[in-house]
């Protein structure tokens, strides 16, 4: 360019959000995968295998059963996981594969995959997971990512018809969109989804 040597590297930047894919194993069985891409922070890649075991990769590391991540996020025991997901066959198959049985073991197993070879302790694992996923300076879906996430997960349909236990705030302005006690109509649920509200109670 203008007499100077330059190297042009093309790069594909994917927008924050959640992406789904379906593949097939050698017998033609459908294998599902999804990737959660934040604006800033670790990617989460989910996939199923031919045995219906559900795995996750955190930031392109080696895969672990998804129940390891669930335990590390605070839902530690098999009973708590079953209470949350019901008798979902893929979760039951995954629990059979998962050697961890509680929160601390889940934390340690996940830490081993993310930081192989480093000294292992519950405190260091806890601090890593907290900083990776719960520190807004390190993990952020951004408004567009949150909007797309909510839209793909049909957030609107799941909250319509329910009564709010807490006020719903607009994450951009802090203003109250709907007050506690309101039973949400589809239009109100739409407003909440379009405002990229991360959660409601």
Model regions: which residues?
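N-terminal non-catalytic structural scaffold regions of very large proteins
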Residues: 1-201
């Amino acid at each position: 360019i203008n007499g100077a040597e330059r190297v042009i590297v093309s790069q594909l930047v994917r927008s924050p959000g959640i992406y789904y894919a379906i593949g097939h194993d050698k017998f033609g069985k459908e294998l599902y995968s999804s990737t959660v891409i934040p604006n800033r922070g670790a990617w989460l890649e989910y996939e199923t295998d031919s045995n219906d075991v559900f795995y996750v990769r955190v930031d392109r590391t080696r895969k672990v059963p998804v129940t390891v991540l669930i335990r590390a996020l605070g839902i530690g025991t098999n009973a708590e996981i079953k209470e949350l997901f019901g008798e979902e066959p893929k979760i039951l198959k995954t629990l059979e594969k998962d050697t961890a049985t509680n929160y601390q073991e889940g934390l340690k197993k996940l830490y081993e995959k993310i930081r192989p070879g480093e000294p292992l302790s519950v405190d260091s694992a806890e601090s890593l997971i907290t900083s990776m996923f719960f520190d807004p300076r390190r993990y952020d879906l951004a408004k567009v990512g949150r909007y797309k996430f909510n839209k793909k997960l049909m957030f609107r349909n799941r909250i319509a018809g329910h009564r709010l236990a807490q006020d719903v705030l607009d994450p951009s302005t802090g203003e109250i969109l709907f007050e506690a006690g309101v039973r949400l109509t589809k239009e109100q649920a739409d407003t909440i989804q379009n405002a990229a509200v991360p959660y409601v109670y």
